[in-house]
Amino acid sequence: MSKTLLVDGDNLFKIGFHGVKELYNDGAHVGGVYHFINTLRRFLDEHNHDKVVVFWDGDSNSSIRKSIYPQYKGNRRQDMNDYKYESYLQQKARVKTYLEEVFVRQVEMMNNEADDLIAYYCKIATQENIIIFSADKDLTQLISERVTIYSPVHKQYFKNGDKISINKVDIPHQNVTVCKIFTGDKSDNIDGIEGLGEKTLVKLFPVMLEKTCTIDEILDYARKNMHPKSPKSLSNILTGRTKSGILGEEFYTTNSKIVDLTNPLITDEGKQLVEQIHTDTIDPTDRGYKNLMRLMMEDGLFNYLPKNDEAWVNFLKPFMKLTRKEKRNTNKN
């Protein structure tokens, strides 16, 4: 099977933009651009991929989930001043231009989140071995025999059979979805069962550490083990009680829809674009290394390369491998 790298673009870009603060060119911050391109370059240098696809959140990307759960991401606040936000947008747009020149495919669609677009790609690309490059643990739901996660933050692979640490509790990857449905997700403002965190969940249902579990199996286990001295959290599970009140089955229906990435929330237009990116070849017209070098010189990135004659060649080599493969695919067709 062919080897494909799927990159969570916003996740990787934010790491560099907020983390690499010292790189500037003529007074303009370029840390986000340099970190993204250099991190991708280094990963490609160490691995052999036939295709690379970067996924971006589209405009109004939360709209589908907000139509189901209005509070979704209601806790997110713009923490950048106007100047910094303008730099963020400019650098992100610049990264996309760089990627065009090195034959990296890109997916972005209004009203669609990158996570769902990635999930849909994994669903349809049944003949590809896939590495997802992201520090977002939500994507660990997609781990399978042919889908592996690489976290650039932990510098660690998460593969089929591994456990995922969620709030310091190691959960088998196949139970991450069920765990998040019950406990919610504070970072996305998704309520969970009141009084139920990951530690309490696995204490009440230790079977979750041993085998794949479904919502119905957990609820059935809760009913069978309910007694007058049971902890309140067990009763809350059966009634679907959150801080917003008793929701019953509606709680599980709603959380399943907005949490479960194995059933991605994606528009028809999003599906069509992913299918197109999956099967189409890349048009090589007007793409090339001269353009890439020009961009790097304009942004002053050459200042951050090693001071030797081979610096440019070594920087470009990993992208050259990918470009040759994509050009061969184009010529076949």
Which stretches of residues belong to each language-model region?
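Non-catalytic, usually N-terminal nucleic-acid engagement modules in DNA/RNA processing proteins
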Residues: 1-71
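Extended two-metal-dependent nuclease catalytic cores across DNA- and RNA-processing enzymes
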Residues: 2, 22, 77-283, 290, ...
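Short glycine-rich phosphate-binding loop at a beta-alpha junction
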Residues: 6, 50-58, 106-108, 129-133, ...
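Generic intrinsically disordered, low-complexity segments enriched for polar/acidic and small residues
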Residues: 33, 66-69, 85, 147, ...
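Short, low-complexity, polybasic intrinsically disordered segments
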Residues: 69-75, 79
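Long, highly charged low-complexity segments enriched in Glu/Asp and Lys/Arg with interspersed Ser/Thr
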Residues: 286-333
